[in-house]
């Protein structure tokens, strides 16, 4: 990531669709209406397949009619646009038992893994528990499609002063002219004034299955973008995508 963004250049890559899907995940959304409204049709086929397998009425729509109904009919979208507890649900609202519930009562609570990740990066960046998981074995049978890329982990490290100097010069190139022979203390002071990050962050994700030609380039770009977003949120520099 330090050398550039990992977007494949040997075939057409619709970056807008990649970003739209990632934002859909981060919203905690599991209904394709948001995607359809933003002209992103990555998940249309999965929702339509679920409709065909479930619908018991007299009139069965074709796929184009189905997508149009999702876009224009809120009640239809609410009923048929859901994919079950897929990525967004697990990332932002993983359901679990509430251990603070009164005795003999069964309460549920949601765990926001993304918020927890951001919090832990700010408070304990050297932790080896900086993970997000979408493989909820208790809900796999409710998902239209179980997660292919099912989890990711982030790692951070301290940046050396030399690395921070390189970043500072990119932020404000004129510094190289005026501070080229500056002392170490002077450079540290300038880096602090410019709010140059002190740490770099890397991300590693896991997949159980992938369409190498079609899906993998999307996954690489999506997790690259996610790393950029997380790094921005915690004032770190994107380092390695693994």
Predicted regions and their residues:
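Terminal, non-catalytic protein-protein interaction segments that mediate quaternary/complex assembly
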Residues: 1-242
